[in-house]
């Protein structure tokens, strides 16, 4: 299986979610199922069916997280420098609107565009990889063709 690139903070966040699911959510849902079972006939017991559905979701998420974490290739951006690569925090200016944007290029499981965390597999990240400060890049986005100039690259 292919390794999954991830920052240390992304890895820690997924580990914390896994711990929460295993130590808090799973025991709570087992207790809820047991309580619902005590109410009698399971065929018409909405609480029981709801709890079982939630248990299925929790177990699926635990399995997914364990798989992702087992394949994680944790890359510490503070040890990197130079042209843009995984982990870089990149400040760009839109050449059409002069709007500045800062994104950090991260793995797909930690990406969150609202928090400035850009999936390495996204069109913008793929266009930026290997580029340097001062370079211009053309990116085909869902909103149309965009031109960006790279203002700065940081690894922190």
From Swiss-Prot:
Coiled coil feature spans: 46-66
Keywords for the protein's UniProt record, in alphabetical order: Coiled coil, DNA-binding, Transcription, Transcription regulation
Disulfide bonds: none
Superkingdom of origin: Bacteria
Transmembrane segments: none
GO molecular function: DNA binding; RNA polymerase binding
GO biological process, alphabetically ordered: DNA-templated transcription elongation; regulation of DNA-templated transcription elongation
PROSITE patterns with a match to the protein in the record: GREAB_1
Similarity remark: Belongs to the GreA/GreB family.
Chain's role: Necessary for efficient RNA polymerase transcription elongation past template-encoded arresting sites. The arresting sites in DNA have the property of trapping a certain fraction of elongating RNA polymerases that pass through, resulting in locked ternary complexes. Cleavage of the nascent transcript by cleavage factors such as GreA or GreB allows the resumption of elongation from the new 3'terminus. GreA releases sequences of 2 to 3 nucleotides.
Entries under PANTHER family matching the protein: TRANSCRIPTION ELONGATION FACTOR GREA
Name by which UniProt lists this protein: Transcription elongation factor GreA
Organism of origin: Ruegeria pomeroyi (strain ATCC 700808 / DSM 15171 / DSS-3)
């Amino acid at each position: 299986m292919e390794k999954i690139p991830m920052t240390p903070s992304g890895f820690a966040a997924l580990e914390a979610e896994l711990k929460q699911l295993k130590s808090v959510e799973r025991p709570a849902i087992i207790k809820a199922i047991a309580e619902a079972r005590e109410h009698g006939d399971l065929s018409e017991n909405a609480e029981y069916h709801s709890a079982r559905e939630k248990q299925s979701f929790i177990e699926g998420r635990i399995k997914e997280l364990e798989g992702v974490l087992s394949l994680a290739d944790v890359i510490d951006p503070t040890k990197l420098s130079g042209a843009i690569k995984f982990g870089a925090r990149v400040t760009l200016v839109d050449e059409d609107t002069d709007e500045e944007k800062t994104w950090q290029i991260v793995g797909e499981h930690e990406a969150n565009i609202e928090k400035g965390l850009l999936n390495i597999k996204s069109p913008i990240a793929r266009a930026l990889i290997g580029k340097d400060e001062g370079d211009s890049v053309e990116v085909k986005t869902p909103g149309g063709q965009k031109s960006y100039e790279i203002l700065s690259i940081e690894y922190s």
